[in-house]
């Protein structure tokens, strides 16, 4: 359960400085897209042989479609991933020349954009009793508020299922 993201990488070389501003011009030679955030954790668990059921939210946007496709390529069950028109999929785009990170562009949902959670709790209530463990991967993007976290902890306790946390935010 967690914040699904897309990590995009553009690799290339810098041969000149832009005439519009004193910034390097990256001549892109290769692009790559990978699962980020909770998706990366899910992919790693799947690679270790775990049966992974993904639970999270993406937007109905290009990045969201790519995240779903990458999860499915890893044979990760995506029935717990909901897509919403009003939500923006988190995207981290890194631009790299040689071994130097030139820039990272972040596309995050606006702060006032509430993360749709209605299907999340419903999916967890029917799924938690059937799993061996729940891994919560919180990158602070709004999906896992206190109410959701309390619900997950209570479900784990009720069904004697371990709940493991991978927080990227202050958990006080």
Where are these predicted regions, by residue range?
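Flexible glycine/proline-rich, aromatic-decorated loop/lid segments
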Residues: 16-20
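Divalent-cation-assisted or electrostatically stabilized phosphate/pyrophosphate-binding catalytic cores
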Residues: 22-29
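Ribokinase/PfkB-type carbohydrate-kinase core domain
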Residues: 1-15, 30-172
